[in-house]
Amino acid sequence: MKKLVVLFVVIWFGWQMQARQVLFPFPILGGELSNSAVTCVEDIDNVMPRMRALGLNTVLVPAYWELLESTEGRFDFTLTDRVIDKARENGLKVIFLWFGAWKNSMSCYAPLWFKTDTKRFPRAMTKTGKPMEIASCFSANVLQADNKAFTAFMRHLAEKDKGIGTVIMLQIENEIGMLEAARDHSPLAENTYDAPIPKVLWKTLGLRQRKTWRECFGDDPYGEEKFMAYHYAKYVEQLAQTARSIYDMPLYVNAAMNSRGRQPGQYPSAGPLAHLADFWHAGAPSIDLLAPDIYDTGFKGWADRYALPDNQLFVPESRCCENSGVRALYVFGEHRAIGFSPFAIDQSEPQSTASVTEAYRLIRQVFDLEDVSSYRRWGLLFDQEDKERTIIDDKTVITCRHFFTLPWDPRATDGSEWPEGGAMLLRLAKDEYLLAGSGIVVSFATEYEKQFEEEKELGEDGFVAEGKPSKEQKLIPNRFLGKRKGIGFVDEVRVDSLGQLRYLRRENGDQDHQGRHARISCGEWKILHIKLYEY
């Protein structure tokens, strides 16, 4: 009987003190469409088949307040319906992105009637009183208008999709945050800044007595960022409660990273950033995930910050590039991520989307494995600077390296920029592993054997580059009394629809360097089944 792969993801929310069980078609192999990709039905009709062809199972799609309610009080769901219908036709799931009061900090997707009535819908202001293209989150009118449209949207989704489940998750707003100033200085915001800090935050801030925000932080931009984070979260919580009451599904907010040494106000500050997680959890307990949009260098570091016991990792945006595929393998392997989604995949070059398609092909197969959730697994991601990792699995030492640490590919030493290499590594049983990825080499040793290992510089033939007296002879006079790990075989395999490994070919001789390692070269995408033995 064909195995249906469905994963029940249980997420523990420490701030809610309860377990929330979320049903996902796992893993989310996503792609986010460019901002203007679904503003007309013709574009929707064109883009959905292309996303299916790229190997996605989920499309992240904007829902535009300005087009949904171009006239106040009158709602048009033509685009919403078309997205859902075309997704169903192409076997895709949908995550809607509510472009409401804020998109990348700015209120650019608010309707014109909202933008022009700044008396009803006041703007955030700088310290000098300059209004910004950012609606103030302290305005009840702003919240009421945003939430009214969002309520209509959620009701329509429930009518259209409840019981079918094409829409699997929802993002509320997009990259909320302050720019130009660390906090809002409008009159409404100033009054709140002079009010007492809510008691729910006293423990977070280390308070023992009642204080105002101003008494705590003064004009310090990092303190002002905390103030804004809590109040943005309180605003989002109102929309989250609306969603929960109408069509309950997983909810998340996404964050632009505080990278490159910038201070609050120089990036979209006060968003759901890792260092502000306590403020977001306190203000928006109905939000399930705080999700990073990762565009800067150091992908692993950013992902690691959001893979927390109280926050399962989901990467809704990442630069679509030739490294996207191995980055997807990393987050699913290392952090058991819910999903991964390169941004503007509909506008990306073929060499960039190719890596996504290849990686998603491997990831689908890995998650088709029977009992995949029970296997110990790791994610690997390497570049020219960070090119090696050692894993201790019981008493087996696994050395994982970038493929270009081997000498025989000329790109390794000719000054070329190294593409990133990465993989998922799974332990199937004792001395049995599965490696799925690209640009990776893995070797195995016993702990005892590793103590006797010496560094060797290899030549192009894979042997020692230059003969010299053995360090082992000089430094380790004792006899070798332990055991070594050997590679019994390395097979390229695929995973069939029943979750079973199917042999494709044996990788021996030059392909595993006479039993020294298992490897997948840069540009190749494979699944290798590795069996070890001891001698």
Per-segment meaning from a language model:
Residues 329-451, 458-474:
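Aromatic- and carboxylate-lined catalytic core of secreted/periplasmic carbohydrate-active enzymes
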Residues 120-277:
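Polysaccharide-binding and catalytic clefts of secreted carbohydrate-active enzymes
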Residues 43-121, 232-246:
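Aromatic-lined substrate-binding rim segments of carbohydrate-active enzymes
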Residues 27-40, 62-80, 127-148, 156, ...:
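The substrate-binding groove and active-site-proximal loops of carbohydrate-active enzymes
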Residues 411-417, 434-535:
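C-terminal beta-sandwich/jelly-roll accessory domains of carbohydrate-active enzymes
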Residues 4-13:
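Sec-dependent N-terminal signal peptides
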Residues 4, 17-57, 89:
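N-terminal carbohydrate-binding accessory modules
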Residues 92, 238-248, 275-374:
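Catalytic-core region of carbohydrate-active enzymes that cleave or remodel glycosidic bonds
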